[in-house]
């Protein structure tokens, strides 16, 4: 790795999107003009028109962010979650620019690139920590897999024609059992992702909690559950039914052994997000989902 400048920003982009390529070019030019160094993965640099001053790294490891003060991610939700993997492993804050649809993890839109560069150069941003979950898979008392998630860990059925038979547990006590398509164990950040699509509540990110949301459960009591952030959630797949599959943030998957037990608890390592705006989460929610608020009068003054 070549010698870095005093201030360096790592850039991660979805180079399969033409909009991302153009956006990356604009961000790189703006940062270099302002005297900041830019670092990019060599595999992505092949698809980007980058000047020679850009530092290239070969391997996508947490160490490739050593010395970087910020990780800028250009893309949709999938790219932002990929960036979150780098951010968590390195401790470097992530600043997302949404080039997709909803982009709840993003702090800016494509039209905000000039402002993004200006805020980064002047360090006019704040950093907040987002809760994660750690996931442990047990089989006959042995740990067979571990993972983590920023949004959610989902236990889902594999066979389309048969339900996944599960028993839910919270803090060492059984809650209920039923057949379903799956169970989503989510963070407040993930409450607007898969858990939201499954009928779960929207939880403000300032709230510390864990969510357990059934997917298409065949039961009268199959409501979303909101627990303490210190609770331990467990999904036990019944041994006499087809096995399931574990998805973490929709990116990493592993087939579960028959009769597996999946435990989800508050993660030991958060993801740090860079924030440019002081807008409330309520305003972000309204904007992202284009919610109808016509007729709102507000509290009398």
UniProtKB/Swiss-Prot annotation:
It catalyses: NAD(+) + ATP = ADP + NADP(+) + H(+). Disulfide bonds: none annotated. The active site is at 77 (proton acceptor). It comes from the Bacteria. Keywords: ATP-binding, Cytoplasm, Kinase, NAD, NADP, Nucleotide-binding, Transferase. It holds the Pfam family NAD_kinase. NAD(+) binds at residues 77-78, 82, 151-152, 162, 181, 192-197. InterPro entries: ATP-NAD_kinase_N, ATP-NAD_kinase_PpnK-typ_C, NAD/diacylglycerol_kinase_sf, NADK. Its EC number is 2.7.1.23. GO terms for cellular component: cytoplasm. Transmembrane segments: none annotated. GO terms for biological process: NAD metabolic process; NADP biosynthetic process. Its cofactor is a divalent metal cation. It is found in: Cytoplasm. Belongs to the NAD kinase family. This is NAD kinase 2. The gene is nadK2.
């Amino acid at each position: 790795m070549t010698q870095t400048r005093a201030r360096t920003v790592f850039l991660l982009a979805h180079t399969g999107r033409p909009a991302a390529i153009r956006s990356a070019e604009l961000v790189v030019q703006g940062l270099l003009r302002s005297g900041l160094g830019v670092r990019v993965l060599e595999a992505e640099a092949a698809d980007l028109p980058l000047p020679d001053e850009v530092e290239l790294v070969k391997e996508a490891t947490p160490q490739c962010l050593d010395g970087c003060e910020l990780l800028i991610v250009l893309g949709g939700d999938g790219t932002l979650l990929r960036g979150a993997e780098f951010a968590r492993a390195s401790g470097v804050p992530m600043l997302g620019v949404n080039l997709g649809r909803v982009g709840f993890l993003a702090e800016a839109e494509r039209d905000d690139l000039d402002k993004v560069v200006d805020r980064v150069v002047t360090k006019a941003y704040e950093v907040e920590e987002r809760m994660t979950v750690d996931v442990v898979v047990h089989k006959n008392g042995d740990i067979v897999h571990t993972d983590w998630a920023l949004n959610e860990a989902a236990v889902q059925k594999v066979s389309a024609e048969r339900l996944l038979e599960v028993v839910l547990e919270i803090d060492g006590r059984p809650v209920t059992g039923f057949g379903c398509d799956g169970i989503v164990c989510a963070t407040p950040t993930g409450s607007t992702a898969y858990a939201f699509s499954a009928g779960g509540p929207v939880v403000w990110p300032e709230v510390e909690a864990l969510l357990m949301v059934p997917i298409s459960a065949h039961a009268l009591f199959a409501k979303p559950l909101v627990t303490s952030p210190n609770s331990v959630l467990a999904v036990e797949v019944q041994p006499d039914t087809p096995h399931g599959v574990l998805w973490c943030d929709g990116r990493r998957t592993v087939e579960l052994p028959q009769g597996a037990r999946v435990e989800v608890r508050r993660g030991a390592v958060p993801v740090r997000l860079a924030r440019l705006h002081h807008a409330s989460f309520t305003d972000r929610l309204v904007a992202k989902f284009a919610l109808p608020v016509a007729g709102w009068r507000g509290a009398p003054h």
